Amino acid sequence: MAKVCEICGKGVVYGHQISHSNIHTKRKWLPNLQRVRAVVNGTRRRITVCTTCLKSGKVQRA
């Protein structure tokens, strides 16, 4: 399962965690993804969707 929303394409973002002493360590921010049953092209499918798309009503749940 890819860490990407199937509706909007939101995915992992990479960057640095910066400590108080200004040391940079690599880290990643993950989207809040949920597996939901939704109606896609008239059929019920299980898709990976971010919670932003769920709250905004871009997904018709089955």
From Swiss-Prot:
InterPro entries the record matches: Bacterial_rp_bL28, Ribosomal_bL28, Ribosomal_bL28/bL31-like_sf, Ribosomal_bL28_bact-type, Ribosomal_bL28_sf
Keywords on record: Ribonucleoprotein, Ribosomal protein
Pfam family, one: Ribosomal_L28
A GO term from the CC aspect: ribonucleoprotein complex
UniProt record, GO biological process: translation
SUPFAM superfamilies registered for this protein in UniProt: L28p-like
Entry annotated with the keyword Ribosomal protein: yes
Gene Ontology terms for molecular function: structural constituent of ribosome
Family: Belongs to the bacterial ribosomal protein bL28 family.
NCBIfam families referenced in this protein's UniProt entry, alphabetically: L28 (TIGR00009)
UniProt protein name: Large ribosomal subunit protein bL28
Name of the gene encoding the protein in the UniProt record: rpmB
